Amino acid sequence: MSHSVKIYDTCIGCTQCVRACPLDVLEMVPWDGCKAGQIASSPRTEDCVGCKRCETACPTDFLSVRVYLGDETTRSMGLAY
């Protein structure tokens, strides 16, 4: 089942999500939009198993990283039958 990982612009660049991911799905990339000068990126979503450890590790009030499991992705896009 395919999962998607969305990084929101509320990311503070703390690297907690990157360190929490057991499969190295996430990485940090340069970004001028926050004090840390970096933001999480999800270049390897095909490896995501949906454990949501990245979500749990995120210290922001609004989860800056969200994992949408395959069926959640379909529902959120209005494609559920």
Curated annotation (Swiss-Prot):
It comes from the Bacteria. Keywords: 4Fe-4S, Electron transport, Iron, Iron-sulfur, Membrane, Metal-binding, Oxidoreductase, Photosynthesis, Photosystem I, Repeat, Thylakoid, Transport. GO terms for molecular function: 4 iron, 4 sulfur cluster binding; electron transfer activity; metal ion binding; oxidoreductase activity. It catalyses: reduced [plastocyanin] + hnu + oxidized [2Fe-2S]-[ferredoxin] = oxidized [plastocyanin] + reduced [2Fe-2S]-[ferredoxin]. It is found in: Cellular thylakoid membrane. Binds 2 [4Fe-4S] clusters. Cluster 2 is most probably the spectroscopically characterized electron acceptor FA and cluster 1 is most probably FB. Its EC number is 1.97.1.12. It is a peripheral membrane protein. GO terms for biological process: photosynthetic electron transport in photosystem I. [4Fe-4S] cluster 1 binds at residues 11, 14, 17, 58. Residues 2-31, 37-68 form the 4Fe-4S ferredoxin-type domain. Coiled coil: none annotated. Its cofactor is [4Fe-4S] cluster. Transmembrane segments: none annotated. One of its GO terms (cellular component) is photosystem I. The keyword Iron-sulfur applies. [4Fe-4S] cluster 2 binds at residues 21, 48, 51, 54. Apoprotein for the two 4Fe-4S centers FA and FB of photosystem I (PSI); essential for photochemical activity. FB is the terminal electron acceptor of PSI, donating electrons to ferredoxin. The C-terminus interacts with PsaA/B/D and helps assemble the protein into the PSI complex. Required for binding of PsaD and PsaE to PSI. PSI is a plastocyanin/cytochrome c6-ferredoxin oxidoreductase, converting photonic excitation into a charge separation, which transfers an electron from the donor P700 chlorophyll pair to the spectroscopically characterized acceptors A0, A1, FX, FA and FB in turn. The cyanobacterial PSI reaction center is composed of one copy each of PsaA,B,C,D,E,F,I,J,K,L,M and X, and forms trimeric complexes. This is Photosystem I iron-sulfur center.
